[in-house]
Design a protein with these regions (language model features):
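Acceptor-binding helix/loop patch of EC 2.4 sugar-transfer enzymes
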Residues: 52-61, 108-146, 187, 191-192, ...
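Nucleotide-activated donor-binding/catalytic signature segment of Leloir-type glycosyltransferases, i.e.
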Residues: 251, 257-285, 289
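A short, well-ordered alpha-helix in the C-terminal region of glycosyltransferases
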Residues: 352, 359, 366-381, 387-393, ...
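Conserved donor-binding/catalytic core segment of Leloir-type glycosyltransferases
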Residues: 200-222, 228-233, 243-244
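Conserved acidic donor-binding segment of nucleotide-sugar-dependent glycosyltransferases
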Residues: 338-339, 343-350, 359-364
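Aromatic "clamp/platform" in nucleotide-sugar-dependent glycosyltransferases that forms part
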Residues: 306
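N-terminal subdomain of nucleotide-sugar transferases
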Residues: 1-46, 159, 407
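Short hydrophobic beta-strand element within catalytic cores of glycosyltransferases
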Residues: 323-326
Length: 407
């Protein structure tokens, strides 16, 4: 069996799947990516190079689609030059355009991974009135779905990682898309009692309480500004607290720079209030093993997100048994039940977030069961092996489908 995975990045959402299939099932796995060609264990990497893309003169609303078409053609040309690759199945991430032309090259089924379908109302776009979007951004939002719609029509089947993300897809396409999470390696992300109280070279004394926050980028989409307000209140109420922040000073989503005039949302947030930065440790991007230690020594972990793609970090924190206080938003409610696997508060209420955290710090034994339940919940519903088994079952099912050759 030969599966061709397609994604601009590697390993992205497919690297661990390809590794599992090649090592445990003996399937041949190739991976088309912008990364250099070569091999990673048994996975062959095939490089594609985009030769163009959207420019400053490209209409703003069509730039995403323009880039996707360049991706589609680059992948097509790279694979046309490799006639020895004859996959039984193509699996690709929707939206980048990378699988759009492959029906003209291969007579095999295609599965797409659908991460997020954009909406202008009741979504990440309009959730924060304090960071309003422009009319042009709302128009662009609709245009960004063009390649997703093409993939929804073109694919034989698809999958989305969470019920929330699945619910954002157009109703007429949902039946052909399953909900299968990427999977959490609970052998790695697990409670480790007695772990050294050292993170990123910083030793945390036994007497200090630890409040943690982890993010890819410090931005409004992940409520960094509201987290900082809550953290300030926590440090003002307790002198024995250190705030550990893992993540990079960059904006991954949204238009924060347009609102703040600063390329650094973090620095803009710090300029809006008087923070005692001696109480904070900004650790930058830290490797997974350090994140495990961060979650292990955390007395309470804070997580905020607008209605958007759920961060893996919150499930990693849950798997490590962290007690979590998080935003009461749809993607979070799917994984955290208030009072059983964590605490949920209004996204826009930093006082409530601070009070929830202070309650945990004051009576840790009263809330310990939340972390224990969270770890068990991840093991039961999001553990890597069962998730991969479901993916493999989907792949095997689709390979045997009677297909519509005219799609």
């Amino acid at each position: 069996m030969h599966i061709l995975f397609v994604h601009p990045n590697f390993p992205a959402q497919f690297g661990h799947v390809a590794d599992r299939l090649s090592r445990r099932a003996g399937w041949r796995c190739s991976f088309v990516t912008e990364k250099p060609a070569g091999r990673v264990n048994a996975i062959e990497l095939v490089q594609f190079t985009r030769k163009g893309g959207a420019t400053a003169t490209t209409q703003y609303c069509s730039r995403t689609f323009e880039n996707a078409i360049w991706n589609a053609h680059a992948v097509f040309e790279a694979l046309k030059a490799r006639p020895d690759l004859r996959p039984d199945l193509v699996v690709g991430h929707s939206g980048f355009g990378t699988t759009a032309f492959l029906r003209e090259l291969y007579d095999c089924p295609i599965i797409n991974y659908f991460e997020y379908f954009y909406h202008t109302r009741d979504s990440d776009i309009d959730f924060r009135p304090d960071f309003p979007t422009t009319e042009l951004d709302r128009l662009r939002c609709r245009a960004r779905n063009a390649m997703l719609l093409l993939d929804l029509h073109n694919c034989d089947r698809g999958y989305s990682p969470t019920r929330f993300q699945h619910s954002r897809l157009p109703a007429e396409y949902r039946p052909k898309v399953e909900v299968i999470f990427d999977g959490i390696d609970t052998e790695f992300w697990r409670p480790q009692p007695g772990a050294p109280r050292v993170v990123a070279g910083r030793e945390i004394s036994e007497g200090m309480k630890v409040v943690t926050y982890a993010t890819r980028g410090m931005e409004s989409m992940r409520g960094f500004d509201l987290f900082m307000k809550a953290a300030k209140r926590i440090t003002e109420r307790r002198s024995d607290v250190i705030i550990l922040v893992a993540g990079e000073d960059r904006i991954c989503y949204g238009g924060d720079e347009r609102h703040t005039g600063s390329k650094s949302f973090k620095q803009w947030v710090l300029s809006q209030d008087d923070y005692d930065l001696s109480r904070f440790a900004f650790l930058g991007r830290i490797p997974p093993l350090e994140l495990v230690r961060l979650f292990e020594i955390s007395d309470v972990h804070l997580y905020l997100t607008v209605p958007f793609v759920l961060s893996w970090s919150v499930l990693n924190a849950m798997a490590c048994g962290a007690v979590i206080a998080a935003s009461d938003t749809a993607p979070v409610r799917e994984v955290i039940e208030h009072g059983r696997t964590g605490l949920l508060v209004d996204f826009f209420d930093p006082d409530a977030l601070a009070e929830a955290a202070l309650g945990v710090l004051e009576e840790p034994e009263q809330f310990r069961h939340l972390g224990e339940n969270a770890a068990e919940h991840v093991r039961e519903h999001y553990r890597l092996d069962p998730c991969l088994d479901r993916m493999v079952s989907l792949f095997e099912e689709v390979i045997t489908l009677d297909r519509d050759a005219d799609r």
